[in-house]
Amino acid sequence: MAGGIIQLVAYGIQDLYLTGDPQITFFKVVYRRHTNFSVESIIQNFTSVPDFGSTVSCTLSKSGDMINKIYVYIELPSVNVFYDESGNLDKFKKFAWVRNIGYALIKDVSIEIGGKLIDKQYGEWMYIWSQVTNKSDEGLDKMIGNIPLLYDFSNGKPKYSLYVPLEFWFCRNSGLSLPLVALSSSEVKITISFRSAEECYRIGPTHSIEIMEDIVPFEFGDYIEQKIGQKTIHGLYMGYDYMTKKLYYIKIHSPTAIKKSFESQQLRNSTSQRENYRIYNSLTGSYCTPKPDHSEMSEPTELSQKLHFINAYLYVDYVYLDNDERMMLIKNPQEYLIEQIQYNQEINVKNSNVKQKLTLNHPCKAHYWVVQSDSLVGPGTINDVFNFTTSHIRNHDGRTIGENPVTKSKLMLNSRERFKQRDGKYFNIVQPYQHHYRGPDTGINMYSVSINSQCHQPSSTINMSRIDDISMEMQLKNVNPNNTHKIRSYTTSYNILRVCFNIGGLAFESMD
């Protein structure tokens, strides 16, 4: 008797719960017929010229019956190569776009129906969402420009085309596609605010200092630091000119830091020791020594060109329906359960114990937040836009080595604990593991009351409209008046979009 037959006849009363009165078979495919439809991606242009630092709008044409996915297409310009004063290629000056440039470019993006704001999202939020939901990093990285060709330093850059997927409720679920055919009396408008060019790239070196040694034990891209007493300053090594003995670097420091520059020994100060001024490799401990009585020098970081988008527009997926389904949408009022993003304005923090007051409404399913050092983003920094850790250092594979700035946290509702205080790993690792498809990078924190935070089907919420006082209490690491940070938070919530009489609007406004 074949082994498979033995398994088949070994049938007992317990099997009734598994195979008694069977309802499906695994050996005959069952499918369901669907309504007749087609999808076409159509370019939609902005009403004004899109560019770095601009805010532009696009009123979507009524080219189809419904709208599903939307992509922002941006063609980045090429960046000219740098030349030195002799007309030769500059050996030290380099340019790089920031990581995840597609998301970094978008400050915020909103959708209005009939002149009323329905949802507003942010480039940072789209990055956070991709960190917990995206299953295919390689494809998305190419779409948003998160590739070495763009974020590695080089002398000049080629042009590059970005396709940034928007994450509105109708973009993520075909069953929630926006019914344009039932909104004939309402305009649907997408508005995007782009960040300035200076917020989206890195250029170096920013400074230089003369060194005593003929050779320095650093490689391009090494992180360096100088610590004098209790004061420390950091930098990113860009190169060394053995002819002039100049060490070139990008200076990294917080705007509120006490130590503002790399220093050298002042010979008139007989109490200082030359060894105290060594510049060290932050990871290996190798060092070089600044030449006494020489100060840090600023290096020019201006571009020889003004950066502009080559082109930018929207790719909108229009859905075309068969007559019966189209008429059903037109004649019958529709209600859609949609998701919105509630953003709490960033707060500045300069001490380790923080209470962030949250202004929230409606049934909320999950809360996400990041804490970022001011030394990482902005003028005079490394401009590492999506680094939410305690360190500016990245390994050669691009991964950050820092820790989550959030050491402990708890959510307070009307002065009562929603849960007992828990450590940062719970919010950065455990919660995403429980409620999402993947774990995010270090420093992205979340807390979900829903079973499946990325599923449209509700699975528990908190009605924040019925809570008077909402706050997140946190203990932070390495935060002080000399190393200030910012906190930004995003909350996903439900609302109802009603479509009837050719117009659309929300059932519950923010103050309900």
Curated annotation (Swiss-Prot):
An example Gene Ontology molecular-function term: structural molecule activity
The keyword Plastid is annotated on this UniProt entry: no
A Pfam family: Capsid_NCLDV
GO CC annotations, alphabetized: viral capsid
Localization in the cell: Virion
Keyword terms of this UniProt record: Capsid protein, Virion
Similarity remark: Belongs to the NCLDV major capsid protein family.
The protein's name: Probable capsid protein 4
Lineage per the UniProt record: Viruses, Varidnaviria, Bamfordvirae, Nucleocytoviricota, Megaviricetes
